[in-house]
Amino acid sequence: MRRLILQTGISIDGYLAALDRSHPWNDGSDDEAVKRWILDSVWAAGAHLMGRVTYEEMAAVWPTSTSEYARPMNEIPKVVFSKTLQHADWPETRIARGDLSEEIGRLKREPGNALIAYGGATFDQALSRLGLVDEYRLMIQPAALGAGLPLFKDLPAPLHLELVEATTYTTGASPFTSTGRARLPPTSRSIRTRRAPRPQAAAAVTSFSSTARAYTRARPRAAIP
C-alpha cells in the first residue's frame, strides 16, 4: 500500500498562501540544501497529485522550464483531481473525476513509490479532512500572514501528530513532516511527525527572530513543487 504525502510550504500561522493566492515569503530555492531536499522528495514520488488550479499553474510553467525541478515534474506521472477540467495537455497527466476517497484508495493500492500531493488549498483541506494523508512534509516559513488560505479546515475531530524529525535551514525555513508509518529517505530533511492516538505533551518548539524585513515579491505556486 502506497503512502500519500502532502508536501507544501506553510506560514508559521498555518496558511498555505495569502488570500490572493500569493506566497509572500522566500521559497528557499536559492539555498543548496533546501533545493536538494526538494529534489530528493520530488524524484522519489510515484505520482504527483494536485487540484485543478494548481495543475493549471504548474502546467503553464514546467513543460518549457529549464529548472532542475522540471524533469521530475514532467516525467513522473501526474493525477489532477477535478470534476470540471475537460482535458489535461501536460504529458503524463490523467484526470480523476470520481469520489476523492475512492480515487485515492485506488492509487494507494497501485504498486510504486509514494504519492505526493501539492495542493491547492481546497484539495489539501479535503485530503486532511477525510483522513487520507499518511505523511505531512511542511516547509514552515518564518513569516506570519494574519489571514489567508489555511491548511486545515473543517476537520471532523482534532488531528494529533507525533513529531519524527525537524531540520532548520539557513533561510529560516523548517521542513516539517507528519507521517503515519515509514521513515523518510535518509537524504530528506524535514520536521517529521506521525499520527498520534492521543495528544502529545509537546510536539515541537521552534524559535524565530523577528525582523523588519518583508518579502514583497510574490512567487507563483509553480516556482517550486
Where are these regions (language model features)?
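Short, intrinsically disordered C-terminal tails of secreted or membrane-associated proteins
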Residues: 216-224
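Short, conserved catalytic or interaction motifs in soluble domains
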Residues: 135
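Portal/gating segments that form or line small-molecule/metal binding sites
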Residues: 1-132, 142-201, 205-208, 212-214
